[in-house]
Design a protein with these regions (language model features):
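Arg/Gly-rich low-complexity intrinsically disordered repeat tracts
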Residues: 1-35
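Extended alpha-helical targeting/anchoring segments
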Residues: 37-395
């Protein structure tokens, strides 16, 4: 028979064992949690490998034509028709290793080891938090590591993630393109037209073997394929002419009531085609050279365009916005161009719009900057085909 003393002794042993098991399970759970957090926040380290080669026989377009079939889902970013040597760089990005996209309220991380993470974008976890968290996963050291950033786009509809503005997805917006998409490329080709040099740059993982020679050989290949482009059928638009005119009348009414300062009403056009749309980009850059030319191949879709305008530029601890409002054509006659420029400078409508955009730029920068000022105001900038009225706001 168990005595009271023996019973208490066994009960104490049982309680002690239970306590030890409890604390052991807590320690195990804590260890697993820490391990999971470390895995979730795994950092990817890279070291840059670079090589500079003579570039007087190569252009960004010809080089892109040579490498794009070897390295699919590549990107071309050109700068042309610009006055300053410090900004005259062109880039080709090859071999995506990671990406971050935001669409339908979800941020998706695709990481170098093949893992895919989804993070809901909410009021607490905003789009900028997702982009910052993604960037913090990567640490790149070495010469020219500043070039090894994210390349991609933020679409107009992405305003829903930064402002309290609802965006209704239209039928034509339902495609493969997310609202935000940025890519980290393994290889970069950087063109310096003033020095006639090309910089070949590679992000190399620890223990990896450089394959930069593969890029160099592709660049020096004399044989590459140029494909044709042909439009098929008629150009169509989801909006009829009358529907577009009705939208314009409604926009004018909102302006007259003081609801808004300005409304830009775009109209989508669609054109079926066969062949290579890069030929269309080449035609665009020929008739409209600009400081910002881009062609991105994302696999399921492609985007390209040409723009003279800097949306926002950050250098060090300073941010810059260059409002452009007011445009007139170049004539080829310097005297007539001067007359057109003076007319543009004094035009009341162009001046009203320009003042409004300068004020908007000041307001935008003031939300995140101090010492906001106008660096220059209503400067005439001459491009190959047009003259622009440009100001610069900084903070």
């Amino acid at each position: 028979k168990l005595t009271v003393t023996t019973y208490c002794y066994y009960l104490l042993l049982l309680l002690t064992a239970t306590t030890y098991c409890y604390y052991y399970l807590l320690l195990l759970l804590f260890t697993v949690t820490i391990y999971s957090i470390k895995e979730a926040m795994k950092q990817y380290n890279y070291q840059t490998v670079s090589r500079t080669v003579l570039g007087d026989l190569h252009t960004p377009v010809s080089t892109y034509l040579k490498v794009r079939d070897i390295f699919p889902q590549s990107a071309l970013m050109e700068s042309s028709d610009y006055h300053g040597s410090e900004n005259n760089r062109s880039f080709i990005g090859l071999c995506p290793v990671a990406s971050v996209s935001i669409d339908h309220g979800t941020a998706v991380f695709r990481l170098p080891d093949g893992t895919r993470e989804e993070h809901p974008v909410t009021g607490e976890y905003r789009a900028e938090n997702a982009l910052r968290d993604f960037l913090n996963r990567f640490h790149v050291e070495g010469e020219y590591s500043d070039y090894c950033g994210l390349y991609g786009y933020t679409s107009f509809n992405a305003v829903r993630y930064f402002e309290n503005i609802p965006v209704k997805d239209s039928r034509e917006a339902t495609n493969d393109a997310p609202d935000i998409l940025y890519i980290l490329y393994k290889y970069l080709i950087v063109f310096n037209d003033f020095k006639n040099e090309m910089l070949l740059l590679e992000m190399l993982a620890p223990g990896g073997k450089s394959e930069l020679d593969k890029v160099r050989k592709a660049i020096h290949n004399r044989n590459y394929t140029v494909y044709d482009f042909r439009a098929v059928g008629e150009t169509t638009s989801p909006l009829t002419d009358e529907e577009h005119k009705a939208n314009i009348r409604q926009g004018i009414a909102h302006c007259m009531r003081g609801d808004v300062f300005q409304i830009v009403l775009s109209r989508r056009f669609e054109q079926r085609f066969t062949g290579d749309d890069f030929k269309l980009y080449r035609a665009l850059r020929s008739i409209n050279p600009s400081p910002y030319l881009f062609y991105f191949d994302f696999g399921g879709f492609r985007i390209f365009g040409s723009s003279p305008e800097t949306h926002c530029r950050i250098e060090g601890r300073h941010a810059y916005i260059d409002p452009i409002a007011g445009t007139t054509k170049r004539t080829g006659d310097p005297e007539q161009d001067a007359v057109n420029a003076r007319y543009l400078h004094d035009d009341p409508k162009e001046n009203a719009e320009h003042v409004m955009l300068v004020d908007l730029a000041r307001n935008d920068l003031s939300r995140n900057c101090h010492d906001v000022k106008v660096d220059f105001y209503k400067e005439m900038q001459y491009y190959s085909h047009v003259i622009h009225l440009v100001s610069r706001v900084s903070g």
